[in-house]
Structure formats: structure tokens, C-alpha cells
């Protein structure tokens, strides 16, 4: 049986169709918003997965190019692996949903979002979050708390829910809010230095609209939702838990109060060995239960320390940032480097400048675009002292790279101000919490060292949270380290300048954040951010005046757009010859701006510009030019006076005396002075050598 339900969000129709497709899926829905359609399929394994200590949730976001009427490029002509954007959207769906599954649920759950139709005014990624929540709620999978999502823009001082393409072009805020009907679950934002109060108001504005979408989901569940399965929840054996806790609690507590991380970890390993010696024979088949009890005991001790004893594992106050050091210029041949250290977290970011032609072309379901500024993040195993194979970037690395990229994007100068492509690479050298925000700080240092005239320096910080089981008591923590992140309830990352916020990403491990918690986290992050910015400015107060001697050099010239064809030539013949002869890169814009770039050959840039100017320069009647003879005939000589522009010197105009043979006066390859005597209505240029000589003699006499 097919079930349909509709509602209105921001003046546009949102609709769900259930039972129409995917008859063998636990739940399959068509979710539409305007002409944007996403199909969501939710399924779960029948039994828990054995031998794991986590919830195996898998979220996929699949973009189909037919959704926008495109055929994939390349030889294969079909979609390949998910794009970085698809991976980011999948992570955005995962984060608000994961905390709302029952604790101890170990069944495999997969949510597949397939984008079928896209109207650019209505973002499919926002619809996919709503659809994933609704599909889970309609299924028999034990997920019962609906989550809604909206996009919030800020145009001319007004907040807008789910802004259209035209509105997104003018917004100074790009905010995604996910919430239940009671609390905010997840926020992602990019903004042009938004103040904390405005950001808080925007989040609350989005939260209110989320409540309406949650009500829509609840109505759908009440009308045609499936009966929920009784979940099988993992729980450590009660006898094992009791005995291990009695034996080890005091030892674990003593260890967790050690401030030094390395010493704490070393002592914890010894405690685990003692526990193993004590119980390995008695509970030989209960090793997973023993590990679970150790984890729960550590968590209990750390959370009690923070929540009830007002003490942090490393002894800092709750609003204190770890010791910071900043360095620049540490690599001799790169274009810019920044080494940022905060406690045991250390990131080195390297800036590389390239020609405008080095931009990354983005090909997907969105409108065609390119990226002139990009940030990549690498998290090798040695950063946490572990041994594992080095592979390509995973979802986490892609997500952290995008987050740091978004933090600095509003501060990057325009291509007119700084005509270069910019690539930043953040190498995590040591990780003990908030490496993504350390990457923001390292990136700022690298950009300043590279001489990039960013609007203002940016910095980032991660805020944490500890709450009581009933969520009544909560404490916000500044600059969380690894242990506080691992056992805490929130990771609230905020980056920005002294003027305002440029990016936010937060998610929780509990059923959402209170309004006060959001406000406190924003204010705490501002205080910490200003402190870090002070340290950055002490290291390098402004961008370097000169680029690295190893960086490319770019010059800009402007020509009449009508002359672009003269520079390119038939089939690109002329421009390719210029590039080959001068060893430069040339980028031509539709408005007539031409960017000429060379790595280490400034003379090549000058030569290329000279050629381009010659190609686009108009021949002026009455002017004298130094030209090169390209051809001789029995009636005269053809002379190139500007690149691609030739005129004829008639034999009678070659000399004052009578000339019997052209070759008696000039030969091919000779450079001679000529005067433009006439340009006829067909554009043919008539030249005179003797008039040029006469004029020069006249000027000499004066």
C-alpha cells in the first residue's frame, strides 16, 4: 500500500511517499522538496555483529548525474567513487542520527540516500537528512526520535529558511541546523565573520523550523509507521562487571588522575595487565566484557572528575587553553609554512601558490564551478604513536580538510587582488584533540608566511561538554584534549577572526544541546579564539611583503574582450605558440583580463605580455613602426609591424631613388622603419619606408 504525506517548509512543498518503491527494504521512501527528489532506503541486519565494541552504522549519499540531466564525462561514462562533497553530506547525515540509537545496539544499519532529481533552489543534502530520519522512524529498526534539518541564510539582515540559488549568492551565512523537537543535535556553518549573538539567533531560528518538520515526521510515523523490533542490546555480564570493577576501580581512578598523558597511558597498560592476570583464566571467553568494564570505569572516573570535582585531567581550569607555540618559514623551498603547537597537538601547514589555471574543477550535480583555494588534511598513524598502513584520505580526513577550508575561505583575497591558486596541506604531526582547528591556525601562519594578503588572521578552537545522565547538569570545557573528547558529550568546533565566526561544526553523543549550552560554547570559543590570535600575531603580525623566491610570479593585463580571439588564434594556435616560446601559463577571462604566470622566468612573462600587447594593439595611421620583412615580391615587401599584423611597402615607397629590384634594398628577415600611410576599408595596411626615413631625419634636425 502506498502512503503519502505532505507539508510546507519555507513556502515549498515537502512530500514523502512510502510503500511505492523498494519493497524488500525495511523502509524505502521517496522524499521530495519542490522538484528535488531523494530516495532513501534503510535496512538493518537481523542479529548483532559479534566481536565489536561500536555501533556499525553506515550512511551513503549517492549522487546520480541524471538528476541534473548530465552524462558523466570521461571514457567510462558512469558515476565513479563518491565525490568529496558526497562524503561530506554522508557525514552530515550520520552525525545527528548516530547518538539517537539505543546504547549497546550492535546490529549493522545502512542508510542509502540516492539523489534522483535536483532543483538547484532546494538542496538535496538537506532533504536527505530529513529523509534518513523519517525512513528510520518508519522502519522496524529501533530508532524512535525524529531529527529534522534546515538550511539558514542571512540576507540584508534577515534570516531565511532554505535559501534559493539567488538568495545563496547574496547570503553572508551558510548554516545547517539539525534538531529534535527538544534540542539541537548538529550544526554546520560557514560565514563571513558573523558575531556570536547573530550566530546564536540563526541557530535558534533554524531550530524553530526544525520543530515543524519533526511534527511532520511524527504524523507520518503515527499514520503508517511499522512496529518497532525489540533491540538486542550489548551489556557486559553483570558478574564480570561487578568483580572487575571491585578489583580495578581504585587502580583505574588513580591512573586517570595522572596529568601527563604518556605516563597515564603507560600506567593504564600496567593496570590492564593486572586485570588480565587476575581474570584471564576465570573469564577466558569474556575478554570483550572485561574491556567494556575497563572503558566504562575510565569514563565514569573522568566524567565524575569533570562534572562533580571541577577538575580536568591535565589540571587546567575549564576555560584555559593549552600552551601555544607558533613558527613560520621552517621549510626552505616551500612558498609558506606554519607550525602550530597547542599542548600535545601539533600541525604543520604548507602553502603552495600556483597559476590560476591550477584551479580544481568541480564536476557534480551542482552548477559547474572551480576552486581557487583548497585545503587538504593528512592524519598519519604516527601522529598518535600507532602503526598502521598508510592509505589515501578517509572520510574523517576529507571532513576535517573541508572544515578548515571553510574557516579561511571568506578571508582569501580575490583573484584581482592576488592572482594565484592557493593550496594548503595540513600535516598532523601529533594529535591530542582538535587537530582540525589546529589546522586552521597552522593555515593562517602558512598564508601569512607565503605573503597572501588575507583579510585577517583566523584561529579555531574545540569546545567540549560534560552532562549528567538526566541532562540537567552540564559544564562546557574550552580546548578539549583527547581524553575529554573521548569520554565527553560534545565536540563544538568554532573558527573565526577577531571580528567574527567563519565556521562552526558541532555534534554530540547525547540527545542534543540546550540553548544555554550553545550560547556558552560560542562565548567560550570567542574568548579562546582571541587568545590564540594574539599568539599568532606575536609570531607574524601581517602577510610578508614579498612572495618566496621559489613562488611563481603572475602579471595581469587587460585587453578589449573583442580582441581575445586575436590572442587565442584559430584552434588556439597563437596562444599555444606564445606559451611554448615563453614557457609561461596564460589564463584569459571573458572580461578581457589576462593572467600570465611563470615559475622562475620573469623575462618570459615580460616577453609574453609584449607579444599579447602587440597582438591586441591597434595599428595607427601616421605612426612609425619598426617591422620585420616577411616576404618580398616584384612589386614590394610585406612587413610585420605588430604580431599578426602585416602591411605592404610598395616598391616605389622603399627608397628616395628609383628601385629596380626589391631585394636591392631589403631582404626577408630585415628590420626596417616604416610609416603607416593608409588603412583601407578592408583593413589592408599600406606602408612607406622612405616616409619613415624622412620623418626621422626631420625629427633629428629639430
Curated annotation (Swiss-Prot):
Function recorded in the entry: Involved in mRNA degradation. Catalyzes the phosphorolysis of single-stranded polyribonucleotides processively in the 3'- to 5'-direction.
Family: Belongs to the polyribonucleotide nucleotidyltransferase family.
Catalytic activity reported: RNA(n+1) + phosphate = RNA(n) + a ribonucleoside 5'-diphosphate
Name the record gives this protein: Polyribonucleotide nucleotidyltransferase
InterPro entries: ExoRNase_PH_dom1, ExoRNase_PH_dom2, ExoRNase_PH_dom2_sf, KH_dom, KH_dom_type_1, KH_dom_type_1_sf, NA-bd_OB-fold, PNPase
GO biological process: mRNA catabolic process; RNA processing
SMART domains linked to this entry: KH, S1
Chief location bin: cytoplasm
Glycoprotein listed as a keyword: no
One Gene Ontology cellular component annotation held by this UniProt entry: cytosol
Family matches, as PROSITE patterns: KH_TYPE_1 (PS50084), S1 (PS50126)
Subcellular locations according to the entry: Cytoplasm
Superkingdom to which the source organism belongs: Bacteria
Taxonomy of the source species: Bacteria, Bacillati, Bacillota, Clostridia, Eubacteriales
Residue intervals of the KH domain: 552-612
Keyword line: Cytoplasm, Magnesium, Metal-binding, Nucleotidyltransferase, RNA-binding, Transferase
Cofactor names: Mg(2+)
GO MF: 3'-5'-RNA exonuclease activity; magnesium ion binding; polyribonucleotide nucleotidyltransferase activity; RNA binding
EC id: 2.7.7.8
Domain S1 motif: 622-690
UniProt keyword Magnesium present: yes
Binding of Mg(2+), residues: 485, 491
